Structure formats: C-alpha cells, structure tokens
Amino acid sequence: MKTIIAEKPSVAREIARIVGATKREEGYFEGGGYAVTWAFGHLVQLAMPDGYGIRGFVRDNLPVIPDTFTLVPRQVKTEKGYKPDSGVVTQIKTVTRLFKESEQIIVATDAGREGELIFRYLYHYTGCATPFVRLWISSLTDKAIREGLRNLEAGGKYDDLYLAAKARSESDWLVGINGTQALSIAAGHGTYSVGRVQTPTLAMVCARYWENRRFTPEAFWQLHIATDGCDEGTVKFSSSEKWKEKEPATELYNKVKSAGTATVTKAERKEKTEETPLLYDLTTLQKEANAKHGFTAEQTLEIAQKLYEKKLITYPRTGSRYIPEDVFTEIPKLLAFIGNLPEWKDKVNPKAVPTRRSVDGGKVTDHHALLVTGEKPLFLSKEDNTVYQMIAGRMIEAFSEKCVKDTATVTAECAGAEFVVKGSVIRQVGWRAVYGEEEKEETIIPGWQEDDRLALKAASITEGKTKPKPLHTEASLLSAMETAGKEIEDDALRQALKDCGIGTPATRAAIIETLFKRGYMERCKKSLVPTEKGLALYSVVKTMLIADVAMTGEWEKELARIERGELPADTFRKEIEAYTREITSELLSCDKLFARKDSGCKCPKCGTGSMQFYGKVVRCDNAECGLPVFRLKANRTLTDDEIKDLLTDGHTKLLKGFKSKQGKSFDAVVAFDGDYNTTFVFPERKTTKKFSGRKK
C-alpha cells in the first residue's frame, strides 16, 4: 500500500477520486492500493518553553535557546494553559499507522515552503522511516494531478526547502518567545507581543504615521498661462518654479499678464513605450485587490486559495511574476478560453501572437505566476469572481502588445519665467485596451517649434500646499514589506529585491492580520493607523534591532540562500541565536522605560487593583484585570493630573491641543465608556453625554 498525504481534506478527496481510493475511513480514504489521508494545516508544532521544563516569563530563564527543538501535537489554549488538540491527536494516530503500514509515502501537501514543513514535522514526530516521494504540482486540475502522479519527484530533492522552512520556524520561535517575554517582563504588567517580522512591519506603519502627522504643510504659489491649441482647444502651461512667498509670485504674475506673449524655448517630441504589465504573483494581486476593490490582503489570499482548490487558478502562494517556456506553449489556448468568457468578449484577438515579457524560466522559483487553468468559473460569489477576473484580465494584458505614445514637452519663456506643458497621444493602444484605459490624454500639443511666439489667452496664479506622504494602506505596506522599506516603482527592480523583503508572499497577509489581532493597529477606511498600544510599543523599540527592517530583510535573504542550497542551515541557526541573545538583552533593559509609580487611584474597572503610572501607559496592578489607559490621545499626552481626573471622576476636564487624523486641532473631554475604553466627548455634546466612568 502507498499512502498519499494532502494538506487539507478537500484536496485529499480530489486525489482519492483520481487514484480510486473511494472507501471512506476515519481520517482517510482507501482503495486501489492507496490510502489518502490529510493534515489540516500544521498537526505538529514546536513546543513552548514549558515543554523543555522552563517556566515562562522569568527574567533569569531568558533567553530560552533549546539545543534541539521538541515537536508536539498542535496545542489549544484552555483556562488551565495549553493542551494538545484532541482532534489533532486522533488524526496523528491515524497518519502514524498509515505511514508505518505503507511501502511508500507520496507527499501531496502544498508545493511550497510551509507545505513541505507540515509534512516533514509530522514525519519526524511520528518517527517514520518509510521512504517518501514528492507530488509537486501548480494546479489541482485532474490533468495536473494525473501528470504529477506519473512524474513523482525524489523526496530528497526538497531537503533544502525543508531546511529553510525549519530555520524560519525556529527563528520565529526564538525571536518571538524571547522577545515577547523580555519586553513583557520589562513592562511589569501585560503582554507585549513582538516578532522577527511583525515588529519591523509595525515599525514601518508607525514611522509613516508620525511622518504624516508631524508634517507641516507649506504654502507655495505657481503661475499658469494659456494659449490656443488644436481644434479650438486651449493649452495650459505651468511655471517650472513654485514660490514659497506670495509677493514675488504676484509681482511676476503681473508682468506675465502685461507681456501678452510667450516664446517657445524648447520643443521635444519622443516616442514612449509602456511595457505590458507582468503577470500577478500573490503580493501584486493583493496590492491591486486592495487598491481597486478594498480587499484586505488576508481576504485576497483566502479567495485565491478557494479558487485554487476549485481548480480555477494555479498555485496562489507564488512569489514569481514569470512563466517558463513549457507553460508559455499553453497560453494561446488559455487566452482563447478567457476570450470566450462574457467579461472578456472582444478583448482577446484570436490571431494575435502572445508577447513574451512574462516568459523567463530563470525567474521562476517554486511556482510560476498566477494563471487561470481553463476550468469554467461557475457559481462564484461576487468577491471570488472579482479576483478570478483580475487574474484573467492580467493575463490578457501581459500577453498583449506594448502601448506606444507620442509625447511632447514644450518649454516657453514669458516675462523671465519658464513655463512647461506636457502632452501625449496614443499611437498603439496595446495592452491598455483591455480595461479601456486608453487614458484621457493630458493635452494634444500643436506642432510648435523653438522661437515660436504664442499669444496668451489668460494668465493665473494659484496657491497650493505641500502634502505629506499618505498613511500606509495594505497595498503600500505590502510594497514596503516586499522591498524592506525601499520605495521602488519599477516592476523588474522589485523582482530583483524580493529575496531582501520581509516576510514571504505566503506569510505577509498573516503578519498584517497579527498586528490587528494584537491591537497594534486598526483600519481607518483604507488607511492603516497604529493604535495607542502600537505607538507605545514603537516608542520603546524603534531604535532597537527587533524593529530593524533592513536586518529582517537580510534574514529573509539568508533563508532564501538556504532554500537554494547556498548557506548551511547551522550557520543561520548560530547567527539567529546570537541575534536572539542581543535583542533579549536589549528588551530586558527597557525596564527603566517602564519604571512605575503608584497613582494613588483605585482601578475604576475592578475596584481592587491600584493604577500604576508607567512611561507610556497607566495600568491596573491586579493581574486578573490589568486595565490599561494609554497616555497618548490624538497626538497629545495626558499629564498625571489629567489621568487622575479620568480615573477618579470617569472623565477629564475640557482639554485643548488634540489633533485629528486629518491634522485638525480640537478640544475635548476624555472619558471612559461602558467598557472602560477611553473616548472623546466634545464640548457641544457635553451637556447631553452621560459619562460611563464611575467614581470609586
């Protein structure tokens, strides 16, 4: 008998059907000489410190660095601590028996770093010695599964992939366990979660937040002139210079008005080619789904995974935007299929030869770029269909012709000032025709030449203000994670920097969601805004190694080298252990930042604990309560006396100097609501607002 193990029951069911394992047993299918079983995610995980006999959250026990990591069945949290998940334990027993009864194991977990680890951890935990081979496929269509089963690969081929996955898992454990415990011990109360990837990600969100909020807009003035264009149209020039003072701008404006004409000093005309966009990888799909449709990164990943399991698209957790030559031979057939979908009628030219910008086998790693499979997309929800059609539409774009434009830049002089206008005309629409993006052209520029004199129709002066960088959205944060904070627009350069990004395409959505779950940031429309807790953590760790984005990017680069067989995993392990010792020491030394003093106030929530003043937070010292009150409210830090008013009366006096997320100043009362969260009460509503906080 051979045992096939899949990552999920739904995938196991499809494989079982194909190999003839039609008899349903407890935890597996059987038949045709096969047993087809499954995991449900990780059945086995790394043990917590108590699994090594080490008590957690004790300063003298840190850092916890096991000589050898222990594997245990997946744990669930109970009132008495963590215990093995009973359903997981049952499935492990089933898998163990099947492994030992088999002559061969076929590994059919997801074909990627995490899928490999799911199997290898389970294999090692069971103490199994049965030889295994790998089913490595990029889609779950019947054709792909059958072809994969005919071409099974040696299990050892993916040893380096496993070693990279294991190194990532152990490094996350070392940094997360030790960092979280060290910072929480330093704080004295509460739990402050930190992690190898989550903390640098939070740091990018907080740094952008403060850059945005502390930005001071500066006024500037700009001049404009208008002259006759083509077909009775008007061409508007703008001054190259922007003046910081109104007076010189106004003085020049008056001269321009009096001049009556402008003289062309330079006229440049060029052909501009816009390359077709590359195919989607997961991160690019998530970014565009967020920007265009408001989907979260996690939502897009979940939808893509569903589409994959429905056999509609190829493997979603890919980091490549290219396909190899053998896949390119299938593209004409897939484009013809897309062209028959009602959404893309008349968008695919059946006679056109697909272009090759997205074809490069050397840039394909585990999996190629996202493609539709040619299975009909029936009965999809609105959201699922949106993501499916994004992938289909991008395929049409990627294999279309380039967009070619004729561009013109004309510079003119008037009253000693330089004015510029730019325009373009599309000569070949190419890929931009797919979504009807033939663009509203800026301006059609007449055939002006140097020294031509232009009669002015009008002149104007406008006042503007400089703007800060916007707050991060999930789309911009994914871009920042992809390039470790470097701001790069070019697709090809982004691809080159992927090994230096933080997180992986498969993990970035989960990292972002972790920051929400930990209460470190929240969504405000499309923007990501750090919470008071997130800002408090950032203020403590922002200059420390744990928040160093570039260093985290280097760790990801090292993991990629392990995966390629270029770096021994033991070398990485030694480096991450040294890093763990350093960040643990740094975080434990934060206790002076968390030095506390008694406020003299009872906790308004539990009535038994005393509220303790810390640097950034006031917290109840009753471990069962731990009510936190963060000092920082809307860019204003509450004083000790203001905090005492809040604790004793349930509200402060009317306070000045707050600043909204839009940068506007306001006055307000800070009060407790019914759940002892702080809220603002505004003067005009003060008489009708009933304060929820109670005086103890």
Question: What spans do the regions from the language model cover?
Answer:
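Short glycine-centered, acidic/aromatic-flanked micro-motifs in structured strand/loop junctions
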Residues: 109, 287, 317
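Basic, low-complexity terminal or inter-domain segments flanking catalytic cores
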Residues: 2, 81-83, 125, 180, ...
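Metal- or metallocofactor-binding catalytic centers and their adjacent structured scaffolds
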Residues: 244-280, 286
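Amphipathic alpha-helical transducer elements in NTP-driven molecular machines
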Residues: 9-16, 33-36, 40, 59-62, ...
